[in-house]
Amino acid sequence: MINRLIQRIVPFSRPLSTVKKTMLTPFLESKRPQQSPEYDYSTLSNYKSFQIKHTTLNFLLSFEKSTVSGDVVFDLTTLKEAVKHIDLDTSYLDVNEVLVDDKPVEFKIEERKQPLGSKLVIAAELEAERQFKLRVKFSTTKDCTALQWLTPQQTSGDKPYMFSQLEAIHARALFPCFDTPSYKSTFTANIESTLPVVFSGIATGSTPNGESTVYHFKQDIPIPAYLVGIASGDLVSASIGPRSKVYTEPHRLDDCVWEFSNDVEKFIKTAENLIFDYEWGTYDILVNVDSYPYGGMESPNMTFATPTLIAHDKTNIDVIAHELAHSWSGNLVTNCSWNHFWLNEGWTVYIERRIVGALHGEPTRHFSALIGWSDLENSINSMRNPEKFSTLVQNLNDGTDPDDAFSTVPYEKGFNLLFHLETVLGGPQEFDPFIRHYFKKFARQSLDTFQFLDTLFEFFENKREILENVDWETWLFKPGMPPKPQFITTMADNVFSLVNKWIVKAQELKTTEEFSKEFSESDLSEFNSNQVVLFLEELVAQNCVPVESKIEWSKYSVASESLLSIYKKQVTESQNAEVVFKNYKFQTTARIQPSYQQLANWLGTVGRMKFVRPGYRLLNAVDRDLAIATFEKLKDTYHPICKQLVKQDLEL
């Protein structure tokens, strides 16, 4: 059992007690919500009526039925007003019984309000400041959006597998809860399964129970419901650092150990130097099965990760730096609603890149930012509703599904705002004390954008004129691309030079022999995998190419096929999923027809939405029949969220 680390006291430029309330700019004040933290309209619960002390989860996992059943117990206190009912979020749950202080009470499940689920209304006459225990007995159903259950045939071994994905509003599909990032609780979990279990907390032991085992966990730092993470399957583990293990299926263990060993502890120490000590005790990684829909999920103590990180060259490990950074931004300091998601993800990308910069140099940090800028452009250009979803501060108060708003915007637009602030305020030496101040001030709390702004203006009171000159309207509330910061482009310039050479020679040379004399495999030998990714992306986007020189690759088949032949080792034979995807993007753009079926086959081996969704869009653009047939064949192997979003992308 590992006790929570005690947070180191970090010196600030002035004591918190001396901070005075500072007005923002007139424009920002006109946008200020009536209350801060702003109310979360993505929950149906009456979370504002109670203070929560602790949550206990008692779960039984049934692979045979593909269900989780059991109960959840909340230790609650009413606030200064009496209440007549307790409202919880549910979604596709069967609720069997509700007890207040061990006494059964009446309840009803209201009609479903898509996409927010069904409100569970519990009759309870409770006076002000009353402490009580609320127990709800429940079971998930076949329509559960929080879990994916895999048969042995869908895994890499002979055992079934299950995992949860609760962000943004799917905790309510796993257990009745106050499903809002505004509401944080410590947790105890007792999870019974026939296979090993991992959880977003620290393991405290296990108890045999016939053919099953009850696995016990605790989470002593308050977290919101969406950060609860559960997985169960044929899991084994190995050490990858002094406070870290990796968990995965047996056949992947050696690759995972090689990929992650030594680097994870470096990441933790670098982040601690930037902010303050890691508070969660252990930092472990679960490398999930192929159908896992995200790059990673920052479940406290147990990062859930995609197997596409295993690139066999350590180049994708920056995703772990991202999920680790969430230990401060998102997990310790949390957005109060999904309108302010950038406070989680923008800060996390910023910290991730500070880690990368500290370990590999500032040009590497800036190169990562350039890649992110390109991703942001692609994301906004492909949005169905950029007017609504490309603003940094979102407005989901009309009941919009936060999953529909999910994009690169909160990550990259958020990062670029923080990078811009770092730059105009005087660089890291000026900005770093604010980072520590911000995370210290809001630790274990949830906040909105205006609380961030208030803290920023208060801390940099002596630089108010600089902050007043920031175009806050464009950065926070306008759709589209933000102003582009100045990046160090050294690593990108080498890529852009090679791209431009290919564009020119594609129009001049006519035979594969001529291309082989002009280009060679060594062109890419000094590039890291991220530079290869940018190279392939820029061959398609041609943002670095003069307008009058841009080409359509489909008209230059000899050039495109020569390129793939010359760079076979670094491109077509790569095991790095980032490179593989960009390779297919180039080939489909060049209308190389054999690649269509190859891409379709590859979509059956990955579940990460970063690749699956644009992969289907690429396929749809060149062969809609193949795209639809491939999706119909594979749809039940994807996570429910991924399946639904691809269905929307294909307009099915």
From Swiss-Prot:
It holds the Pfam family Peptidase_M1. Signal peptide: none annotated. The active site is at E323 (proton acceptor), Y411 (proton donor). InterPro entries: Aminopeptidase_N-like_N (IPR045357), Aminopeptidase_N-like_N_sf (IPR042097), ARM-type_fold (IPR016024), LTA4H (IPR012777), LTA4H_cat (IPR049980), M1_LTA-4_hydro/amino_C_sf (IPR038502), M1_LTA4H (IPR034015), Peptidase_M1 (IPR001930). A peptide binds at Q165, L166, E167, P293, Y294, G295, G296, M297, E298. The keyword Cell membrane does not apply. It is found in: Cytoplasm; Nucleus. GO terms for biological process: cytoplasm to vacuole targeting by the NVT pathway; lipid metabolic process; peptide catabolic process; protein catabolic process; proteolysis. Its EC number is 3.4.11.-, 3.3.2.10. PROSITE patterns: ZINC_PROTEASE. GO terms for cellular component: cytosol; fungal-type vacuole lumen; multivesicular body; nucleus; NVT complex. The keyword Metal-binding applies. GO terms for molecular function: aminopeptidase activity; epoxide hydrolase activity; metallopeptidase activity; zinc ion binding. Keywords: Cytoplasm, Hydrolase, Metal-binding, Metalloprotease, Nucleus, Protease, Zinc. Its cofactor is Zn(2+). CDD domains: M1_LTA4H. Zn(2+) binds at H322, H326, E345. Gene3D superfamilies: 3.30.2010.30, Neutral Protease Domain 2 (1.10.390.10), Peptidase M1, leukotriene A4 hydrolase/aminopeptidase C-terminal domain (1.25.40.320), tricorn interacting facor f3 domain (2.60.40.1730). Aminopeptidase that preferentially cleaves di- and tripeptides. Also has low epoxide hydrolase activity (in vitro). Can hydrolyze the epoxide leukotriene LTA(4) but it forms preferentially 5,6-dihydroxy-7,9,11,14-eicosatetraenoic acid rather than the cytokine leukotriene B(4) as the product compared to the homologous mammalian enzyme (in vitro). Belongs to the peptidase M1 family. This is Leucine aminopeptidase 2.
